[in-house]
């Protein structure tokens, strides 16, 4: 299979040195993204497009390659093509007929040709010759250049002919690694996950910092969605996940700060801590999922007061987005279900929050706060690479594993719905229920408490994590299913 990758349009207007640097970075990223699927993958080209060639013939692996490329920043679109040496017009006609002849009977069509290089003919001459030949030989209803039912597309590059089989959309943006790096304040909800996606799509390596306000389930959920975002949109780069224990900080605010200023104070403490993390990691900006007046702390006066605690640039990609648009985007990128089942703690911190915070007043409230508490939180922060975050968490957990399902036991497939669809878990004589990992904690209580449940995932890591959490919650009827 050969693919021709067309770069994001804004890359093409850059200066020659910048353009070449971006293309080289994109080629490097494509190799990194597809390396595990084909170690012999070839990526060539350095100007306005890249040619990707693989010898893989397995249809499932090819589909996975295409899916990964559609989620790789820097790509405008890419083409599946069949490559041939460039022959005469009759040879071009024969190649197009071989690929499109069966589709043309009784239908209108158009021929589109693009060329690069010097030739003794024009693109229009190719289109006319091939179009008339296909109409004559394939029983087409006619030629329609405006709204054809079938498009016969090709590209001619020097002495090579590419007949285009299919076009796939790209993510756009710049290649990850070509721009600066940022730190995303991640709560795991709709807003922060979409904000992270927007930054990654634009081409910025996005690291994650999570402020744990007092819930192991919340931390696990945020780790899972951060891992998902990295795996789907940022896997070409090394990304960090930093978790900062903020329970003491919340306790200090609840006991020392006036109710109306609790929310603003909490956000200021988060920005202070995030700025310290960003400074240590030499990151260029902070990213939040805030939108104007979506909640009380996000009014302009409050945001202004919040930002005063840091000199680090704070980016808010969703600042004028409507909530429904954010939810729709989350659904499109695959984070909506994570967000829907994510525990939320921030909203309970203040009963009557101010929408017009005054700098002098918030400074007065913060004077009561023991900053040593914030320092301790930063000292206790943990840092992992996001690709290993789930595996490392599950390594030392002691959970009973079984290799055989006993009569009456139910196997719960907690894999992502995409994995469940691609490879359904079928066990003869065994009841299997699909309940994705991001929903298992919130929905397990709905299941029959008198039955025994075995959690299943491919590697056993995610199932061990969630079984351990459910056991800690008091559910004694859960184990891990690890078939031999």
Swiss-Prot record:
Chemical reaction(s) catalysed: [ThiI sulfur-carrier protein]-S-sulfanyl-L-cysteine + a uridine in tRNA + 2 reduced [2Fe-2S]-[ferredoxin] + ATP + H(+) = [ThiI sulfur-carrier protein]-L-cysteine + a 4-thiouridine in tRNA + 2 oxidized [2Fe-2S]-[ferredoxin] + AMP + diphosphate; [ThiS sulfur-carrier protein]-C-terminal Gly-Gly-AMP + S-sulfanyl-L-cysteinyl-[cysteine desulfurase] + AH2 = [ThiS sulfur-carrier protein]-C-terminal-Gly-aminoethanethioate + L-cysteinyl-[cysteine desulfurase] + A + AMP + 2 H(+)
EC number, UniProt record: 2.8.1.4
Domain THUMP as annotated: residue spans: 63-167
GO biological process terms held by the UniProt record: thiamine biosynthetic process; thiamine diphosphate biosynthetic process; thiazole biosynthetic process; tRNA 4-thiouridine biosynthesis
Keywords: ATP-binding, Cytoplasm, Disulfide bond, Nucleotide-binding, Redox-active center, RNA-binding, Thiamine biosynthesis, Transferase, tRNA-binding
Pfam families named in the record: ThiI, ThiI_fer, THUMP
Coiled coil: none
InterPro entries referenced in this protein's UniProt entry, alphabetically: Rhodanese-like_dom, Rhodanese-like_dom_sf, Rossmann-like_a/b/a_fold, ThiI_AANH, ThiI_fer, ThiI_N, THII_Thiazole_biosynth_dom, THUMP_dom
Superkingdom to which the source organism belongs: Bacteria
Residues that bind ATP: 185-186, 267, 289, 298
PROSITE patterns per record: RHODANESE_3, THUMP
MF-aspect GO terms: ATP binding; CCA tRNA nucleotidyltransferase activity; tRNA binding; tRNA-uracil-4 sulfurtransferase activity
Pathway recorded for this protein: Cofactor biosynthesis; thiamine diphosphate biosynthesis
Gene3D superfamilies tied to this protein: 3.30.2130.30, HUPs, Rhodanese-like domain
Active site positions, chain numbering: 457
CC per GO annotation: cytosol
Disulfide partners: 346-457
Cell compartment(s), UniProt: Cytoplasm
Rhodanese domain location: 405-483
Protein family (similarity comment): Belongs to the ThiI family.
Function noted in UniProt: Catalyzes the ATP-dependent transfer of a sulfur to tRNA to produce 4-thiouridine in position 8 of tRNAs, which functions as a near-UV photosensor. Also catalyzes the transfer of sulfur to the sulfur carrier protein ThiS, forming ThiS-thiocarboxylate. This is a step in the synthesis of thiazole, in the thiamine biosynthesis pathway. The sulfur is donated as persulfide by IscS.
PANTHER family per the UniProt record, alphabetical: TRNA SULFURTRANSFERASE
HAMAP family per record: ThiI
Protein known as: tRNA sulfurtransferase
Lineage, opening ranks: Bacteria, Pseudomonadati, Pseudomonadota, Gammaproteobacteria, Pseudomonadales
Gene behind the chain: thiI
